[in-house]
């Protein structure tokens, strides 16, 4: 069994003008208390005559996303970058995400930062922090050596 903390998430904070761009990443971990991954799959369902009334399913698309939440740590490079996008629109929200899983996979994908929250909570709490990182396009998945 692998604990959730054994996974690593990096957010692209700057990129070169090369094509494709080369990203500089910052680890998004300080203050982070919860991470969830959703495939957001699109499924086509067919009921064929030979299925005797039971469906056949094909996954035909996906819009993967990471939902991240925790406490705001001002001065942390990754959180500060995400926070700077709170009121940005359009391509100003675009970035890259790199995920290294506890199972030894590295996932890299263009991404969009959404639903940024940099404050809130009970009056005695540290400010909350959360965002959704929407993957754009097909991720590159490789084995970590």
Where are these regions (language model features)?
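Homeobox/homeodomain signature
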Residues: 25-27, 97-99, 103, 119, ...
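Compositionally biased, intrinsically disordered low-complexity segments
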Residues: 35-38, 100, 129, 144
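Beta-strand secondary-structure signal
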Residues: 65-69, 96-98, 110, 130-134
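Short, acidic/charged, Gly/Pro-enriched secondary-structure junctions
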Residues: 78-110
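Short, surface-exposed linear patches
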Residues: 58-59, 88-94, 119-122, 134-136
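Solvent-exposed edge beta-strands and adjacent loop segments
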Residues: 1-73, 112-127
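Mixed-charge, glycine-accented linear interaction segment located at domain edges/termini
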Residues: 109-145
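Acidic glycine-/aspartate-rich tracts in secreted/extracellular proteins
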Residues: 72-75, 138
């Amino acid at each position: 069994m692998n604990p959730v903390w054994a996974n690593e998430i990096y957010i692209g904070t700057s990129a070169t003008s090369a094509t494709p761009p080369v990203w500089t990443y910052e680890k998004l971990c300080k203050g982070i208390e919860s991470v969830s991954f959703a495939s957001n799959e699109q499924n086509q369902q067919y009921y064929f005559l030979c299925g005797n009334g039971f469906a056949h399913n094909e996954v035909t698309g996906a819009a993967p996303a990471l939902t991240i939440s925790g406490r705001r740590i001002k001065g942390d490079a990754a959180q500060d970058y995400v926070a700077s996008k709170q009121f940005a629109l359009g391509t100003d929200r675009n970035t890259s995400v790199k995920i290294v899983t506890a199972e030894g996979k590295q996932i890299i994908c263009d991404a969009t930062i959404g639903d940024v929250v940099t404050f809130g909570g009970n009056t005695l709490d540290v400010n909350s922090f959360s965002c959704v990182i929407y993957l754009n396009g097909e991720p590159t998945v490789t084995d970590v050596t």
